[in-house]
């Protein structure tokens, strides 16, 4: 009863903040994202009747507190679905920096859900596995189905699940990651956004935003898709930063990258910025222009990586297990 899985993190296109049901992690509205590769999380999980307690390790460190509670929510749900009560040994490793705004919880919980479901002997489709991953992170649901994916809002697992959007953009997109160090806490951001006086205004337009994004992505419209993602980043930030704590999570280098992107665009380069929760920046462009864009972002004084569109979460061979 052991399995290993791999999943890619996500960049939000139409993002979400705020949870209608925190236990089931049901969001207030739909969301759309794209997976970024080769960045990934790998997880090995084994249900073992000889263990006295669950063991959770991420990047070589034992997980405790709220992090352990979130993993346990996924583990316990899999136990319930499989009708087993064995304790689990769980180990995960990330190939990219975590907690700086690049979707590590998405890839982590997506890989965890895939590995746990396989280790428990369950036969589930990826949309079904996405409902398991959602118990740890809504973004993880979209990382399970990969590529450009749409998590639909709903009242339960029958309808709140992820589906992939087929698009020609998967071959064209290149993402330059501008890494701006600044620890972030997504759960706090959910609470801040929902308490903002601007949250109702965001809810009023988000459904039209989702419909427009789906149409642009399905039609392979690069500029329309990522202009929308850029605007949505600003909308999300405005909502989150006007919560009770007045939390400003951007750093000076974040703004510098924004301005550099707009200068490139004024020079007819197809390029748009996007941010989730954190100071780091996704800079979306095409294969033709990626070298020029990366050089410009690096000139802002940050480390960079270049990513492509990542596929769905998948089971790996036993030879790749972490233990």
How would you name each of these model-derived features?
Residues 24-25, 34-37, 141-143, 166-172, ...:
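Solvent-exposed alpha-helices and their adjacent loops that cap or buttress functional pockets
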């Amino acid at each position: 009863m052991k399995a290993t899985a791999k999943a890619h993190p996500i960049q939000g296109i139409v993002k979400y903040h705020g949870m209608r049901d925190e236990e089931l992690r049901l969001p207030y509205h739909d969301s759309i994202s794209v997976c970024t590769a080769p960045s990934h999380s790998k997880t090995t999980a084994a249900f073992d009747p000889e263990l006295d307690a669950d063991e959770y390790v991420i990047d070589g460190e034992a997980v405790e507190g709220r992090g352990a509670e979130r993993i346990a929510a996924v583990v316990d749900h899999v136990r319930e679905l499989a009708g087993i009560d064995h304790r689990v040994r769980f180990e995960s490793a990330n190939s990219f920096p975590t907690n700086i705004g690049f979707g590590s919880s998405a890839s982590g919980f997506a890989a965890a859900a895939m590995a746990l479901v396989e280790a428990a002997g369950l036969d589930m489709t990826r949309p079904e596995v996405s409902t398991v991953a959602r118990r740890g992170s809504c973004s993880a649901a979209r990382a399970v189905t990969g590529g450009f994916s749409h998590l639909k809002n709903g009242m339960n697992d029958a309808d709140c699940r992820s589906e992939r959007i087929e698009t020609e953009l998967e071959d064209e997109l290149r993402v330059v990651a501008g890494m701006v160090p600044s620890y972030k806490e997504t759960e706090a951001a959910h609470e801040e956004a929902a308490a903002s006086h601007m949250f109702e205004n965001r809810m009023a337009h988000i459904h039209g935003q989702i419909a427009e994004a789906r149409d642009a992505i399905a039609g392979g419209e690069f500029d329309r898709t990522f202009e929308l993602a850029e605007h949505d980043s600003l909308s999300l930030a405005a909502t989150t930063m006007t919560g009770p704590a007045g939390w400003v999570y951007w750093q000076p280098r974040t703004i510098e990258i924004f301005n550099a992107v707009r200068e490139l665009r004024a020079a007819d380069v197809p390029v748009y910025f996007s941010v989730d929760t954190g100071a780091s920046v996704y800079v979306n462009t095409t294969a033709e222009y990626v070298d020029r864009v990366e050089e410009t972002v690096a000139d802002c004084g940050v480390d960079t990586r270049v990513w492509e569109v990542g596929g769905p979460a998948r089971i790996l061979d036993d030879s790749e297990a972490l233990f």
